[in-house]
């Protein structure tokens, strides 16, 4: 396998005021034909969201979406009627399959939320959507 080194300062970047985001792969307004995906890894975004702000309800289909809070509180809601707040030490996984709507917000009114969002292309499309969260401090290794 060929070794690829992508320096942090060469990533895509956008600052929308409420969202400061860094993209490892082409995403939203950032497009780099050399960085579409790495195998099944499609998205690796490093996001900082200001207090009380976030991503309004929007759809996903046929993607594994993983969110990892690094600092702060991430509030999740979805069309499967899940509603949860996760924090550092937790991991959220959505298998979006045939389709799911969800929102993600900074649950704090005073502190920034920092989190990673990772998308992985699934092996099988149009499966039943599933949401789960895990407390990695409780995982027996």
Describe each PLM feature range.
Residues 15-59, 63-64, 115, 121-122, ...:
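A short glycine-rich, His/Asp/Glu-containing loop-to-beta-strand
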Residues 78-95, 139:
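Short acidic-glycine-tyrosine-enriched beta hairpin
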Residues 64, 84, 90-92, 100-102, ...:
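Generic beta-strand structural signal
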Residues 76-79, 93-94, 101-109:
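Short beta-strand His + acidic residue motifs that chelate non-heme Fe in jelly-roll/DSBH
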Residues 48, 72-76, 91-92, 125:
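Short beta-strand segments in beta-sandwich/barrel cores
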Residues 1-5:
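Basic/polar N-terminal segments that are highly enriched at the extreme N-terminus
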Residues 97-101, 109-141:
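Conserved, well-structured core segments that form or line functional sites
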């Amino acid at each position: 396998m060929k070794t690829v080194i992508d320096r942090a300062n060469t990533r895509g970047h956008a600052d929308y005021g409420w969202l400061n985001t860094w993209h490892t792969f082409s995403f939203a307004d950032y497009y780099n034909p050399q960085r579409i995906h790495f195998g099944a890894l499609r998205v690796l975004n490093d996001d900082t969201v200001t207090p009380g702000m976030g991503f309004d309800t929007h759809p996903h289909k046929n993607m594994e979406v993983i969110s990892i809070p690094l600092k702060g509180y991430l509030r999740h809601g979805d069309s499967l009627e899940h509603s949860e707040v996760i924090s550092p030490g937790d991991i959220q996984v959505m298998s979006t399959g045939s389709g799911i709507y969800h929102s993600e917000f900074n649950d704090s009114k005073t502190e920034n939320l920092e989190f990673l969002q990772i998308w992985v292309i699934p092996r099988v499309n149009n499966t039943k959507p599933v949401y789960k969260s895990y407390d990695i401090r409780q995982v027996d290794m």
